[in-house]
């Protein structure tokens, strides 16, 4: 079994309010209070140590959204924010990994990936960020699944990413 641990720092102020998520299995809201940390220009590879120092706890991700895909890897994340960035740290354990999408805004959803959703303005427009285990990123924004627009490369280039498996696509087996 591989341990994959990847981390991405979202270098934009997307959401400074407490985050909430609905668990469709039991329709209960889970509220997370996102801690503000006072740092600037932190190297992305230093984020796990910073979150350790700030005692930011990991939260489990244990909801299966699609009955057709019942497999659930062991996933946990932690989140904090600075004045101008959201810091995300994901740890994922699963039986096998895949990272074939080798360029941003590619089909990372076909790889081993995690997602982060945010509605920063409360206006119904949400941001969907998907990152595969090699740090390849897809960012879309829109009011629904069908009409999201992908972020331009100059925005994607501002997102700092680090992956414990490295940043190169993993070859298909």
Regions found by a protein language model. Give the residues of each.
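Structural preference for beta-rich elements and adjacent junctions enriched in aromatics
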Residues: 26-173
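Bacterial Sec-dependent N-terminal signal peptides
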Residues: 1-29
């Amino acid at each position: 079994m591989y341990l994959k641990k990847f981390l991405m720092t979202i270098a934009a102020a997307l959401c400074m309010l407490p985050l909430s998520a609905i668990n469709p299995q039991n329709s209960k809201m889970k509220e997370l209070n996102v801690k503000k940390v006072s740092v600037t220009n932190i190297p992305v590879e230093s984020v796990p140590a910073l979150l350790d120092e700030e005692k930011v706890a990991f939260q489990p991700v244990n909801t299966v959204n699609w009955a057709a895909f019942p497999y659930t890897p062991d996933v946990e994340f932690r989140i904090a924010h600075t004045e101008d960035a959201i810091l995300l740290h994901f740890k994922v354990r699963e039986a096998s990994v895949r990272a074939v999408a080798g360029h941003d805004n590619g089909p990372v959803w076909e790889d081993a990936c995690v997602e982060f959703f945010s509605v920063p303005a409360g206006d119904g427009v949400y941001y969907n960020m998907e990152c595969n285990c090699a740090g390849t990123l897809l960012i879309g924004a829109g009011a629904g699944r069908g009409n999201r627009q992908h972020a331009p490369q100059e925005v994607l280039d501002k997102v700092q990413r680090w992956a414990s498996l490295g940043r190169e696509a993993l070859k298909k087996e």
